[in-house]
């Protein structure tokens, strides 16, 4: 039977011919070439059905419709009598997608890019999309300065009409900026202007933020910084006329020319406030206090706008609009600011919702909120809630947004989105020094037990000099008003001689508890009681120990080891101020604690101790990746009623939490072992640390972006350069002529300050916080022991 060709068409690969006959009635439709696509699915996409009278136009629409499905590379429609024969060539199915040579672009990002273009495993391959993807990726590389980059899509046929898709990258090298020229600057030198650029044609080794590799995005940011520089200095007519970026023939060098018009400096002639200010005109007027006669300042204007928005936001106006229109008088060189304000609607908060807290219970987050549901929205209260969630330390990131309630003109929902971090830690520490070798400790802590916000700790350690066990518990919301309750029980068998401290053994155990009372958002008080039993033995005849025992009415024999037991009850009082922006890796704010301890009647000892700790963070750039950290710790203790502070209550310094680069607890007075009762010249100085009843430690730290690390990890990794200093002294020390004659240092002198400098890396790992530091002593004294590299898990600051 002869087959008549009605139409052969392929929109992409073939041609079309018209069949001049009149239309005919379709009695059957037959497909050839279908493999993956079902007949029923193909029929559903055709505008022609059995029984229809079709024409050439209908056949053309059929071909268009089948191509539009994206399933076919070629479509041909034939007629055999009254039967339509549809011959198709299906597009191959993507069996796998791989990447090769991509270093600057991660696989996940590439997969997202392909997904957006509907290129994924199991889908039909549209070859026309591949060229668009190649061009798009190459354009990305050009935008980051890699003009030699090329991207090729390699398609490998497989059986059953399947293909492997491989994107092959040749990234090349980034073009380096050879020169940046600014043309038109008269009031400021090019060097002064270029110092504000991230892109530089000459990068000093010490400048970690500048970059000689061209990136279009960074150039855009630099141009904005240049514009802000002039606008902040009164140049209201400043303009960037043009920017030329020229490429060297080998595509490895870039020349940038920026043409500017500075204009003249303009002064503020006045401010005019207009619009709907929702009754807060007097308060807004105070915020718009830019002095007439002062130079026009773009940043100051932006700050004024934001301050007005924040003010209105505090009173429930969630979406105020504030726009400043400068009226420039070129003749008088003045600018009048017309500030147009529209407060908009006042909003209630319908609901406060949380997302991302898979472990932490909603109630734990909700109790940190200061914005109430069914109350007027307060933008300051919403931000305070975000700040309080950050301070908990349970979350890596906290974001908040207000969402309008559909169909309601005056209601919003507040949604806090959190990303939880591991709040449990395996506390384990290792230190290594040229003299100390390796030290080790282990424990466990969970700061968000079962998502309740309660803290539970179980710590146990055993090493050459100590066997220690502790169980602790804290409920930060023992009452709904935020009163906290906590306590611990502990046991410690400590052999000081094995720890290179003054020789004695102390078996102690005890229990303590406390209640914490919030005063306001940043201040809290803590009151507690504790009981400790100390059983001292194997005490060698050492000056500080014997002096303490004498004050307790004991008369130990110089020729034998002494023993002593004491049961003490103490009252603990503490104050904390905390306005840090977050619990882990703060970038701004201050945290200070003042703690006092005094024994109460019924105790064998009579003494008090006071410590003051403070940490202050000061960001030095807008995105808070560069931060200055200042830390200090002061401590003092003394006896009461003629008794001395027990030597085992002394302060110590040295190690990862005080003065890095020195052996733990090694800074300060050393043991003087007495060989003769009345002749100090026969006493023996040693290198064993005994601590002192007074201490001062200070540290200055520069926190920087971690080199070679993606910025998205900045909430879990932190690098810093530091200088530590500290001293420990003994105010009971008698620096007699006999002591000097025997070559014993003056341990009562607070000026024996140790100093070290180094670098630290902190990482909040799945195991818990890891801290690495390398430091070298700059100032040390005879008898000090160094420990350059220190490594701990379970401690951050």
From Swiss-Prot:
GO CC annotation terms, alphabetical: Bam protein complex
Gene source species: Photorhabdus laumondii subsp. laumondii (strain DSM 15139 / CIP 105565 / TT01) (Photorhabdus luminescens subsp. laumondii)
POTRA domain segment(s): 24-91, 92-172, 175-263, 266-344, 347-421
Presence of the UniProt keyword Signal in the record: yes
The entry's keywords: Cell outer membrane, Membrane, Repeat, Signal, Transmembrane, Transmembrane beta strand
Annotated function: Part of the outer membrane protein assembly complex, which is involved in assembly and insertion of beta-barrel proteins into the outer membrane. Constitutes, with BamD, the core component of the assembly machinery.
Lineage, opening ranks: Bacteria, Pseudomonadati, Pseudomonadota, Gammaproteobacteria, Enterobacterales
Family matches, as HAMAP family: OM_assembly_BamA
One GO process term, biological-process aspect: protein insertion into membrane
Summary of subunit composition and partner proteins: Part of the Bam complex, which is composed of the outer membrane protein BamA, and four lipoproteins BamB, BamC, BamD and BamE.
Recorded superkingdom: Bacteria
Annotated compartments: Cell outer membrane
Transit peptide is among the record's keywords: no
Name of a matching Pfam family: POTRA
Protein name listed in UniProt: Outer membrane protein assembly factor BamA
Entry's family note: Belongs to the BamA family.
Signal peptide range: 1-20
Stored InterPro entries: Bac_surfAg_D15, BamA/TamA_POTRA, D15-like, OM_assembly_BamA, POTRA
Main localization of the protein described in the UniProt heading: membrane
NCBIfam families (UniProt xref): OM_YaeT, PRK11067.1
């Amino acid at each position: 039977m002869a087959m008549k060709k009605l139409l052969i068409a392929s929109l992409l690969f073939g041609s079309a011919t018209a069949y001049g006959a009149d239309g005919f009635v379709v009695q059957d439709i037959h497909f050839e070439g279908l493999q993956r696509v079902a007949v029923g699915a193909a029929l559903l996409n055709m505008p022609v059905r059995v029984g229809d009278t079709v024409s050439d136009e209908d056949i053309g629409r059929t071909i268009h419709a089948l191509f539009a499905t994206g399933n076919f590379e070629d479509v041909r429609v034939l007629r055999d009598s009254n039967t339509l024969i549809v011959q198709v060539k299906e597009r191959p199915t993507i069996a796998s997608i791989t990447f090769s040579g991509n270093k600057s672009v991660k696989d996940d990002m590439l997969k997202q890019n392909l997904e957006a273009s509907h290129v994924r495993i199991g889908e039909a391959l549209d070859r026309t999309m591949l060229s668009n993807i190649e061009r798009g990726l190459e354009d990305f590389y050009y935008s980051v300065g890699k003009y030699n980059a090329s991207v090729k899509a390699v398609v490998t046929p497989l059986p059953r009409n399947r293909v492997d898709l491989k994107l092959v990258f040749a990234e090349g090298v980034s073009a380096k900026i050879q020169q940046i020229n600014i043309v038109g600057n008269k009031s400021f030198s090019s060097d002064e202007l270029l110092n504000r650029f991230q892109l530089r044609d000459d990068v000093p080794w010490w400048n970690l933020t500048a970059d000689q590799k061209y990136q279009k995005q960074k150039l855009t940011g630099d141009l904005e910084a240049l514009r802000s520089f002039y606008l902040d200095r009164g140049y209201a007519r400043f303009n960037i006329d043009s920017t030329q970026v020229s490429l060297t023939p080998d595509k490895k060098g870039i020349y940038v020319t920026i043409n500017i018009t500075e204009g003249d400096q303009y002064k503020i002639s006045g401010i005019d406030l207009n619009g709907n200010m929702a009754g807060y005109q007097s308060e807004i007027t105070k915020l718009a206090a830019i002095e007439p006669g002062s130079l026009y300042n773009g940043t100051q204007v932006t700050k004024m706008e934001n301050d007005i928005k924040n003010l209105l936001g505090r009173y429930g106006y969630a979406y105020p609009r504030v726009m400043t229109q400068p009226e420039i008088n070129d003749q008088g060189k003045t600018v009048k600011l017309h500030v147009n304000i529209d407060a908009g609607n006042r909003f209630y908060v319908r609901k406060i919702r949380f997302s991302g807290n898979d472990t932490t219970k909603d109630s734990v987050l909700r109790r940190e909120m200061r914005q109430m549901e069914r109350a007027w929205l307060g933008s300051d209260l919403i931000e305070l809630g975000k700040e309080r969630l950050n301070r908990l330390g349970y979350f890596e990131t906290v974001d908040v947004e207000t969402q309008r309630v559909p169909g309601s003109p005056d209601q919003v929902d507040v949604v806090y989105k959190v990303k939880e971090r591991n709040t449990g830690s395996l506390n384990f520490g290792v230190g290594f020094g040229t003299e100390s070798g390796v030290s080790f400790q282990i424990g466990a802590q969970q700061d968000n037990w079962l998502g309740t916000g309660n803290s539970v700790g179980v710590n146990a350690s055993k090493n050459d000099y100590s066997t220690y066990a502790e169980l602790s518990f804290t409920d930060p919301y023992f009452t709904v008003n935020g009163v906290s309750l906590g306590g611990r029980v502990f046991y410690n068998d400590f052999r000081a001689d094995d720890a290179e401290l003054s020789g004695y053994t102390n078996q102690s155990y005890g229990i303590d508890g406390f209640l914490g009372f919030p005063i306001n958002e940043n201040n809290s008080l803590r009151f507690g009681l504790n009981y400790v039993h100390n059983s001292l033995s194997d005490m060698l005849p050492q000056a500080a120990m014997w002096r303490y025992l004498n004050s307790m009415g004991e008369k130990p024999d110089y020729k034998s080891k002494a023993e002593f037991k004491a049961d003490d009850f103490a009252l603990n009082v503490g104050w904390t101020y905390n306005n840090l922006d977050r619990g882990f890796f703060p970038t701004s704010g201050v945290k200070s604690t003042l703690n006092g301890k005094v024994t109460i009647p019924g105790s064998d000892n009579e003494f008090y101790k006071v410590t003051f700790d403070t940490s202050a963070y000061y960001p030095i750039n807008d995105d808070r990746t560069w931060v200055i950290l200042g830390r200090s710790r002061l401590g003092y203790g003394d006896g009461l009623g003629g008794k001395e502070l027990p030597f085992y209550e002394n302060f110590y310094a040295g190690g990862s939490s005080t003065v890095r680069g020195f052996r733990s607890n090694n800074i300060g007075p050393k043991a003087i072992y007495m060989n003769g009762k009345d002749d100090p010249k026969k006493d023996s100085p040693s290198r064993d640390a005994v601590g002192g009843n007074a201490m001062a430690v200070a540290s200055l730290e520069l926190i920087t972006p971690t080199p070679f690390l993606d910025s998205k990890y900045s909430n879990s990794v932190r690098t810093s350069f530091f200088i530590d200093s500290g001293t420990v002294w003994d105010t009971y020390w008698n620096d007699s002529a006999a002591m000097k004659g025997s070559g014993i240092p003056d341990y009562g002198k607070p000026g024996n300050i140790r100093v070290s400098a180094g670098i630290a890396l902190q990482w909040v790992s799945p195991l818990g916080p890891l801290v690495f530091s390398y430091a070298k002593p700059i100032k040390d004294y005879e008898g000090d022991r160094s420990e350059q590299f220190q490594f701990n898990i379970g401690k951050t600051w």
